[in-house]
A protein has these predicted regions:
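Conserved NAD+-utilizing ADP-ribose enzyme module
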Residues: 1-226
């Protein structure tokens, strides 16, 4: 594999900002585009660009599907693609688009998003001195969950939020049996030490559907400034 970085491309920044990508589907299959006389699945960072391109080229499609990039990385990537598969990013009337290894580009995007989110979380907590988490009724501890609902592993990930409305949304959609509570930064720091000693992990500002950035307690505690 090449050590080519995708960071310099405009699409990379678009995905970091909007956290979503677009595919076109026809008869429940992903639409493929021609690129140097081969056909690859087309991906776009803007819905309107996808629609106008497909329409102008008379490429048949039923709909353009918006996909959250965390959900894509967590659930769809392995379902839809093999290790060596390539996609065409942002093909338009003017541009032939970029041929990308889908696994490599997804990994690089998610690595970058993780870095950004860890930094923002640490800054928010340092500034507002509040960490939100979920508790089972009557408990004072934040809950632990497993990755991707897998029951094989004991729950080892503590979901925490610095963004209250996102925490509430996830509570309402995915954990309605739980209460949302808040603790001070210093208390979180102590809990993090315990998690680190137990080799556990932390999920930072998870989205609904329980997807997002999961990081070892060790790594997060290295980043803390409070």
């Amino acid at each position: 594999g090449s050590s080519m970085s995708y960071k310099a491309y405009p699409f990379f920044r678009d995905i970091l900002i909007n956290e979503c990508i677009y595919f076109a589907s026809k008869n429940k299959k992903l639409v493929r585009l021609n690129y140097k006389s081969e056909a690859y699945v087309g991906v776009w960072t803007e819905e309107s660009v996808a629609v106008s391109f497909l329409t102008s080229r008379d490429i048949p499609f039923d709909k353009v599907v918006k996909m959250d990039v965390d959900r894509f990385a967590t659930y769809e990537l392995d379902e839809l693609f093999d290790e060596q598969d390539h996609i065409i990013m942002n093909q338009t009337m003017e541009e032939e688009g970029h041929l990308l290894n889908v696994v490599a580009v997804t990994q690089e995007v998610m690595t970058e998003l993780d870095k950004i989110r860890i930094k923002e979380f640490v800054q928010d907590v340092a500034k507002y001195d509040e960490v939100y988490g979920l508790t089972k009724k009557g408990s004072k501890q934040f809950i632990l969950i497993s990755e991707n609902d897998s029951d094989e592993k004991k729950p080892h990930i503590m979901p925490v939020w610095s963004i209250k409305n996102r925490a509430l949304k996830v509570r309402d959609e995915d954990f309605e049996e739980c209460d949302l509570i808040t603790i001070e930064g210093s208390v979180f720091g102590e809990w993090l030490d315990e998690l680190r000693d137990d080799h556990k992990a932390v999920a930072i500002d998870l989205k609904t559907g329980v997807v997002g950035t999961i990081v070892s307690a060790q790594k997060l505690s290295n980043e803390l400034t409070f």
